[in-house]
Structures are given as C-alpha cells and as structure tokens.
Amino acid sequence: MDTQAFRRSLHHSDRYNRRGFDSPTKRAQALEEAYQSDLISSIRDNGFTYNKGRLNIKLAKAFGFCWGVERAVAMAYETRRHYPNENIWITNEIIHNPSVNDHLRKMNVKFISAKNGIKDFSLVSNGDVVILPAFGATVQEMKLLHEKGCHIIDTTCPWVSKVWHTVEKHKKHVFTSIIHGKFKHEETLATSSFAGKYLVVLDLEEANYISEYILGRGNRNEFMNKFAKACSDGFDPDKDLDRVGVANQTTMLKSETEEIGKVFEKTMLKKFGPENLNSHFLAFNTICDATEERQDAMFSLVDEDLDILVVIGGFNSSNTTHLQEIAITKNITSFHIDTPERISVEENSILHKPLGLDLELKNNFLPSGNINVGITSGASTPDKVVADVIEKLTVIAS
C-alpha cells in the first residue's frame, strides 16, 4: 500500500479531523480545570521543592503531561461534547494513565476490545465516531475505519507522525527501518505499519547482536528465531540489512536511541567504507523533545541527595518505565506507582511495581526522621495525581 497517498486522501476526507473542535484557549481552560493543581503550581514557583515538617520533596524540573498528551486528552473530551449522542469508540487507551481512561469510560466512550492482540472492530458501524489515541493507529486500522464510513478523530502526537514520515522515507529509498522500540507497543505497531522492510530493536544488546550479523559473524536460524515477531513479513537478514535507516518509538531512552544509531553507523562504515556510507545508512532525528526533557530532568534529580524516589505513571507506560530505569542506575530506592491509591496512609505502605516484576507491597516505606523524597511522573500523568501522592506522603510524615 502507498501509505503516503492513503494518508493524504484521508486528511482531505470530510469524515477526518485532526484539529479538534475547541479553540486553544477553551482547550487549555478545560484541561486546567480537570487536571491542574494549585499545590504543584506553588511547588514549581518554589524551585520545585516542598518542605513540610520532616519531609523534603524535590520534584523533577520537567514531569507530567506533555503537550502531545494534553492535545490528545483534550480532543477526546471535545469529541464527546461535539457528538453528544453518537457511538464513540477509541482504538486503544488514549494515553497510558488509568484515571484518564476511566474518565473516558464514564463519558460513555467505548474501547475496542482485543483478544490475543487482535482488535475486534465488528461492532463499529457506519457513522460511528472513532478516536485514534496519542500513540496513533496502524494504517490498516485507519483504512478499515475509513471504509466503514466512520468519523475519525485523530489525536496522534505530531512527534509520532514525524517518525512515520521517517520510515516512509526509508521505504521510498529502499532502506530497511531499524526501529528502536518494543515490538508489541501500540506506537511501534503503528510506526511499523508505515514502513517497508523493518526490524524492531529493543536495546543496545540487540543492536550489537545485529551488528555482528551484518559483519558476517552470526547464525541465520538463530537470528530469525530471535527476531521472528519483530520484523516485517518476508524479512531476509542476508539482504535486508545492507541499507538501513534508524527511527524510534518516541518514548524510548534518548541516550540508548543515540547509541543504537551510532552502532549501525559504525557497522556500515566498517562494512562498506566511508565513501559508501550514505548509500547504506540514513541518519535520523526522531527523538521527542518532551521525552528528552523529562529524561534530562530525571538525570538531574537523581544527582540530588535523595532517600527514596517515587515515579508516577501507568505501569504500561514506556516513558515512565525509562524514568524508573534511570533511578535504578543510580542505586536509588525507587517506587513506581500508577495511582495515589497505591499508597496506604494508615499502614505507611506502598504497592509498587519493581522493574520487570509483579506488584510488590512495601511496608514502612517512608522511614523515620528527616527524609528527602524525589518525585517525577510520566508524560501521561496529570498534576492532580502528583499532588495527591504528595499529600499522602505529607500525612504519613506527620
């Protein structure tokens, strides 16, 4: 499929909307009423610090809702107001935040069900309204919904769309897209649907493994078994890794994406020589500004004198998970929670998710004496949620 041509035609359809319905001023006011916090505003004004008794809280200098998330959430709410009586569906969680998604359910926005990773669009009918989430949707889903005669409200983050343009450029010039991401993640599924040949790479270890194969030091069967679910149909590592371009899931760790890009650039340089590098490697710039800002702020926060660190965000949120990884690299005791309800004031306990593990209950997690607590949150976490966490910590400390 010519994905560029399809997107152009979709954008000209009178059943497609990617701008929303409210003015920017009205949109900002609605979000402020729903999710902003006076406490968080005052903490920002106080140099991102908050002192209450024995508790000293230090907030990351960039955290919480990014503008892409704000835009998606606002457009979803606007859609219900604009279509008060129509069936409204959403193809996935609007963002990775349970409270926001629960609010949409209360507004009678229906979520497309999925079984074994396959979405069921059978209940979606002509004239229904369908919201595409901030992560985007696959081109196949867009085509299906367009053919069904649905009104499509596209809240895809522009940074995600930028990555789609990048992989389409790779396809046009017959380059394989190396996508730094998680192959099951909604954003990467969408991005790969716009690519030609592609290979999804999780981390630096996998990048180095592929590099070794490109340089002739690998086993084909082992390679294909390793990446069976992370590559395009008919992928041939002996042919499709001669010309590569790098792109990324926008929520991945910035420093790792850059390192992976360097691995493939050096590999192609070694195999084909400097005079042929541009024919075999395409440079990239698809790192999201908001992701970069939050990660940089987290690196600064973990350099502070902290006793514990609380990371707030959906458990399936990639950008939040990477913030937790930064804390772990500094050996700081950290707790990843998705809602304030994970903290029990009465028990001084926290039900948190260690990286890569199941939920775990930690009793007496807030120690006695003076304590320095670092706090950050993922790009899908409203300020009000962060404020509720701080208020619970304050009560425990008192």
Curated annotation (Swiss-Prot):
Residues noted as binding [4Fe-4S] cluster in the record, renumbered to the chain: 66, 157, 288
Catalyses which reaction(s): isopentenyl diphosphate + 2 oxidized [2Fe-2S]-[ferredoxin] + H2O = (2E)-4-hydroxy-3-methylbut-2-enyl diphosphate + 2 reduced [2Fe-2S]-[ferredoxin] + 2 H(+); dimethylallyl diphosphate + 2 oxidized [2Fe-2S]-[ferredoxin] + H2O = (2E)-4-hydroxy-3-methylbut-2-enyl diphosphate + 2 reduced [2Fe-2S]-[ferredoxin] + 2 H(+)
Entry keyword set: 4Fe-4S, Iron, Iron-sulfur, Isoprene biosynthesis, Metal-binding, Oxidoreductase
Residues the entry annotates as binding isopentenyl diphosphate: 96, 185, 317-319, 380
Cofactor names: [4Fe-4S] cluster
Biochemical pathway: Isoprenoid biosynthesis; dimethylallyl diphosphate biosynthesis; dimethylallyl diphosphate from (2E)-4-hydroxy-3-methylbutenyl diphosphate: step 1/1; Isoprenoid biosynthesis; isopentenyl diphosphate biosynthesis via DXP pathway; isopentenyl diphosphate from 1-deoxy-D-xylulose 5-phosphate: step 6/6
Binding site for (2E)-4-hydroxy-3-methylbut-2-enyl diphosphate: 96, 185, 250, 317-319, 380
Record's keyword annotation contains Methyltransferase: no
Cofactor binding summary note: Binds 1 [4Fe-4S] cluster per subunit.
EC top class named in words: oxidoreductase
S-S bridge residues: none
GO process annotations (BP): dimethylallyl diphosphate biosynthetic process; isopentenyl diphosphate biosynthetic process, methylerythritol 4-phosphate pathway; terpenoid biosynthetic process
EC number(s) given by UniProt: 1.17.7.4
Active site: 187 (proton donor)
GO molecular function: 4 iron, 4 sulfur cluster binding; 4-hydroxy-3-methylbut-2-enyl diphosphate reductase activity; metal ion binding
Annotated dimethylallyl diphosphate binding sites: 96, 185, 317-319, 380
Record flagged with keyword Cytoplasm: no
Role of this protein: Catalyzes the conversion of 1-hydroxy-2-methyl-2-(E)-butenyl 4-diphosphate (HMBPP) into a mixture of isopentenyl diphosphate (IPP) and dimethylallyl diphosphate (DMAPP). Acts in the terminal step of the DOXP/MEP pathway for isoprenoid precursor biosynthesis.
Family matches, as NCBIfam families: ispH_lytB, PRK13371.1
Family of this protein: Belongs to the IspH family.
PANTHER family recorded: 4-HYDROXY-3-METHYLBUT-2-ENYL DIPHOSPHATE REDUCTASE, CHLOROPLASTIC
Name of the protein: 4-hydroxy-3-methylbut-2-enyl diphosphate reductase
Species: Prochlorococcus marinus (strain MIT 9312)
Gene this chain is encoded by: ispH
